[in-house]
Amino acid sequence: MFEATTILGYRGEMGGKKFALIGGDGQVTLGNCVVKANATKIRSLYHNQVLSGFAGSTADAFSLFDMFERILESKKGDLFKSVVDFSKEWRKDKYLRRLEAMMIVLNLDHIFILSGTGDVLEAEDNKIAAIGSGGNYALSAARALDSFAHLEPRKLVEESLKIAGDLCIYTNTNIKILEL
């Protein structure tokens, strides 16, 4: 279900300034073949106030994106209210509950994982979240690197995704990063 990508979200504060970043690799896999190495699986939403990224089935992920973006617009960019309403709406539709995709959504204050089953999970530390086949590698690397206060947030995301790309056969090191 979650093959062929790694997405990492990272938010926090450095030097009194809040930051939020999301990064992902570019690999798309169909079965056991790499069909694209430079796909974009991250995007900014609501006037560049929210970042998002997906892992899983591309068609299902776009369904997730569209639905979430519509709710985010209706809530005027309030991420917390949007994920709650997203989950409520999700659970009402039998088709939606079977989507094979996950998303990370974050802003300067919150970071959430949205699943294709309608679950909403706030990152344990409200700081780092990762999804996809290389998600556990990226999450582990990001948590370790986060303990070094001197590392810039963009560099942390980049290095964590590189580690995931080196270890996970469904993840490459063609990394794209967005930040608020």
From Swiss-Prot:
It catalyses: ATP-dependent cleavage of peptide bonds with broad specificity. It is an enzyme of class 3 (hydrolase). Keywords: Allosteric enzyme, Cytoplasm, Hydrolase, Metal-binding, Protease, Sodium, Threonine protease. One of its GO terms (cellular component) is HslUV protease complex. One of its GO terms (biological process) is proteolysis involved in protein catabolic process. Belongs to the peptidase T1B family. HslV subfamily. A double ring-shaped homohexamer of HslV is capped on each side by a ring-shaped HslU homohexamer. The assembly of the HslU/HslV complex is dependent on binding of ATP. This is ATP-dependent protease subunit HslV. It comes from Helicobacter pylori (strain Shi470).
